[in-house]
Each structure stands twice: as structure tokens, then as C-alpha cells.
Amino acid sequence: MSDDAMKLVVVGAAGRMGQALIRLIHATEGLTLHAAVARPGSAFIGKDAGEIAGLGQIGIPVTDDPLSAFLHADGVIDFTTPATSVTFADLAAQARIVHVIGTTGCSAEDETRFKAAARHARIVKSGNMGLGINLLSVLVEQAARALPPADWDIEVLEMHHKHKVDAPSGTALLLGEAAAKGRGIDLGDHSVRVRDGYTGPRPAGSIGFATLRGGAVIGDHSVIFAGEGERLTLSHSAGDRSLFARGALQAALWARDKKPGLYSMLDVLGLSTR
């Protein structure tokens, strides 16, 4: 480990994403695991983070004290729950460190809290940390801008594993936001999340969402542009959860020397149009 290696905290360290992050940090030059945090009461508290991740002992015990874990760290990687991520954002702001948030299912109130924390922390937040999905979102925005809403309907279809607890997925919403941006509309005013029973005709100009859950699917997303006599489908399939971990670590390194603010993966990847 070099003296200038970025010292990262992994929260939710005992989960599948947490373990993937620990393994990848261990294998990535320029990064070092500073601390690993699990929820209070977890059976993994006190155990070696490396052993949990299948690396063997690395001398980092899992803790349930994020405040001490953030002390002297350079950044935190966070794929947890909305309420927990809000708490971590406040702590990251106090510590003036990087906070990469891959948590999905956040409310408007949560987003307001993240914006407040970003006055002092460098926050990178995205519904998906992968390069492919973020490139897809740019293509979706361009297609939505080019195809007249009177002639083309937009539907977002997603499937995830049976353990996922929020719907639509953060990635589906990211793609919906891209489509809405391309059309110059507000997604909240034009999205259709549920169809059941006698729904009547499809509302003109709406953006529909369909959610599937089952098996061990890591993440499949399609945006369908349905016109008269033709259909355009833009899609992405994730086959390995480590792609999200790689993106999160790329975001942390990118944000290290940035000024406080709320950024997205489009900023990290140089795809932002703002």
C-alpha cells in the first residue's frame, strides 16, 4: 500500500455488494480498505472483513460504529438502504470526505438531505454505477428527443433477482428520467407505474414502467420506443455484480480531488450534458 492510496470505508460490508467491494479494493492499486461497517447486531461484527469476502485475514475487523470508521478515511462506498445512506451522508459531510451512493429506492426527502450534505461532502450518487447503463441513458435521452411523442410510446422494462426490495429499480428510474429529459417533461407527472384491471387507453405522452422479479437475475433493463409499424428497443444486461463495484470505485477516485457537490456517474464518465 502506498502512502497516497485512497482509504475507503465499505458500509454494508457483509452483504453481496459489500463483499464484492472489499475484494475489488484489495485488488486495486491506489486503493486501500480503511474500515468495514455492518449494521448493529450483525453476526459479522468483530470478524475479519477479508475472511467474510473470501480473501483470508487482512486485519480489518467489521465494526458497527460508522463515526469512528469514517475518521481519517478518504471516502465511503455505500450500497445500503435509503435511511442508512442519509445518515452516512451526514457523517461524510462532517468528515468532509467522498461519499459514493449506489443505494436505490430513495425518496424526494432523502434526495433533499443528500443535496444538503453535498455542501460539505463530495457525493456521487447514481441508480447504476456501470458504464454500460450510463451510456444507455444517454442514448435513451437522444432517442426520446428525436422521436415525436405523438407517434412513439416509451416503456421501461426491468427484471431483477427475487430478493430486491424496491421497484421500479433505481436503474429503471434513471432511464425513465433520461427519456423524460429528452422529451422536456417531468417524469413524476408522466410516469405510469401500475396497470391493473380496466385501465382505459394508454395516456398520450406517458412513460410506462414494468417490473419483473425472480431467480438470481442481477439486472436486465430495456427501454422500448413503440411506433406505428416499427419498434426500437435499447437494452442492457448485467451478468456480474462486480461491474457496479468497479464503477463505484472509479467514482470514488474521480471525486477525490473535486470540490464539494452532488455528482452523478455521467459526470464521472464525462457524459454529462449539464
From Swiss-Prot:
Pfam families: DapB_C (PF05173), DapB_N (PF01113). Keywords: Amino-acid biosynthesis, Cytoplasm, Diaminopimelate biosynthesis, Lysine biosynthesis, NAD, NADP, Oxidoreductase. NADP(+) binds at residue 39. It is an enzyme of class 1 (oxidoreductase). The active site is at 160 (proton donor/acceptor), 164 (proton donor). The keyword Electron transport does not apply. Transmembrane segments: none annotated. Pathway: Amino-acid biosynthesis; L-lysine biosynthesis via DAP pathway; (S)-tetrahydrodipicolinate from L-aspartate: step 4/4. HAMAP family: DapB. This is 4-hydroxy-tetrahydrodipicolinate reductase. It comes from Rhizobium rhizogenes (strain K84 / ATCC BAA-868). The lineage of its organism: Bacteria, Pseudomonadati, Pseudomonadota, Alphaproteobacteria, Hyphomicrobiales.
